[in-house]
Amino acid sequence: AERGFAKQACIGSSFSSKTGLFRGNLMGKRVDHCARTVITGAPELDIDEIGVPERIARTLTVPIPVTSFNRAAVQRLIAAGKVKQLVDDASGTIIPCAAGQTPKMLCPGFVAERFLQNGDVVVLNRQPTLHRCSIMAHRVRVVPGLTLQLHPSCTAPYNADFDGDEMNMHVPQT
């Protein structure tokens, strides 16, 4: 097999089989910065909100480029324990952050990886994604519990119900 493709008998089977181009190389790849869990109904949420469990919110991060304009705000986030790590864009060095710590060399060019917080925008989808409404953006509301919480009024586009359906949440990194 050359370049990651399985050896196929004919051109047609190289596209349609389980190890073919589409199913083997383009569909169903693992990605970072996402979560998958069961959904439950939460009518107290706004229709454009998704309830994200605290455990997931303390795992997934949003990159914040440090500039001369937001340097003080990023330092406050680090001191409050809301930043997982700093990444130096120039060297790629990763500096873990702890609550109460204030980095001495925080300067423009660093990227702070902040934990999810209320108001962040995430992309939610339920497979199979058959049409464009099966994947939509929602605002985060961090909630207690272990399941993603969704307003019952916005289940129709996802063809979802609350009988054990799982949904995927992706955190944009730009």
Question: What feature does the model see in each segment?
Answer:
Residues 1-174:
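Core mixed alpha/beta domains of very large multi-subunit molecular machines
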